[in-house]
Swiss-Prot record:
Protein name: High osmolarity signaling protein SHO1
Keyword match Phosphoprotein: yes
Domain SH3: 300-361
UniProt cross-references to InterPro entries, sorted A to Z: SH3-like_dom_sf (IPR036028), SH3_domain (IPR001452), Sho1_SH3 (IPR035522)
Region (Disordered): 252-276
Signal peptide annotation: none
Main function: Plasma membrane osmosensor that activates the high osmolarity glycerol (HOG) MAPK signaling pathway in response to high osmolarity. Detects changes in external osmolarity and activates PBS2 through the stimulation of STE11 and targets PBS2 to the plasma membrane. PBS2 activation leads to changes in glycerol production that helps to balance the intracellular and external osmotic pressures. Activates also HOG1 in response to heat stress and mediates resistance to oxidative stress. Involved in the regulation of the mating pathway. May be a receptor that feeds into the pseudohyphal growth pathway.
Chief location of this protein within or outside the cell: membrane
Annotated organism of origin: Saccharomyces cerevisiae (strain FostersB) (Baker's yeast)
Subcellular location: Cell membrane; Bud; Bud neck; Cell projection
Family per record: Belongs to the SHO1 family.
Glycosylation sites: N59
Keywords, in A-Z order: Cell membrane, Cell projection, Glycoprotein, Membrane, Phosphoprotein, SH3 domain, Stress response, Transmembrane, Transmembrane helix
Amino acid sequence: MSISSKIRPTPRXPSRMATDHSFKMKNFYADPFAISSISLAIVSWVIAIGGSISSASTNESFPRFTWWGIVYQFLIICSLMLFYCFDLVDHYRIFITTSIAVAFVYNTNSATNLVYADGPKKAAASAGVILLSIINLIWILYYGGDNASPTNRWIDSFSIKGIRPSPLENSLHRARRRGNRNTTPYQNNVYNDAIRDSGYATQFDGYPQQQPSHTNYVSSTALAGFENTQPNTSEAVNLHLNXLQQRINSASNAKETNDNSNNQTNTNIGNTFDTDFSNGNTETTMGDTLGLYSDIGDDNFIYKAKALYPYDADDDDAYEISFEQNEILQVSDIEGRWWKARRANGETGIIPSNYVQLIDGPEEMHR
């Protein structure tokens, strides 16, 4: 049996967890940007509707299309509050941005018609729609940007829940790891510290700066005694096997006196082989390599992290693990974008670092 048939990733069906989207007012109260901007929008809308009603009640002419713009703005404000209460803002970002852009056009058009009109009542209505236009422009900047953008990160830093996860940033990290994965035996990546020591580290986490022809990210514990960190892994392994075959054949010729014993010795070369540094049990699969993480002691998981958001592992990635919001995870490595972690049920794998927060003591677990 060849080595290529021995080292294969063991598929794992990750658990899928549903995110809670029930109606909760605390989702709205926990976001200072939502409270402040929507409160200002409500005040501006009251000024606009009050001035419009006062102007229309007199004999003064009033632009009729402004009424639809005011009603449309009211629907936008109500929709935003509902999206926050059900925690669906990230799911409807495109809809929110486009609908607010339409409201911006309506209010700007109404301001053009009212700002040049005479009378204090129309002046109040024009002030209201101008304020609404400014707020709509701020909303377009926020909801139109990704959560990883500098402005969104700065605004979300004041939120009680912290910075929102970025789907774009997450997909770039996954694409980077998938792009480094090849089909040769030693190129099935188990994401670990070797990615930083292999000589192919990148300056930007989103895209590789240098794409190696071979990547050697197999656990050094599983391959103790015959690992090779040079790029030409397959050639090095072939040379190593040839040398072992010559040594075993020489020993077999000296000991064995019949052809049956020689055939048995040659057959065992493809299955297992011993080196001066091995323990005689080097028959390891990629599934066993993943299993080694389950045997790591508690001392190696010296950090604890609290999940800020629920995370569903990617179906195409056997090494990610899912976790729930506020779940406490044990972490063994806190460098890079993806951390090695272990759940309370013993499940181990990698997790995105921007979904969790390190905690120092038991009092932070209940925050």
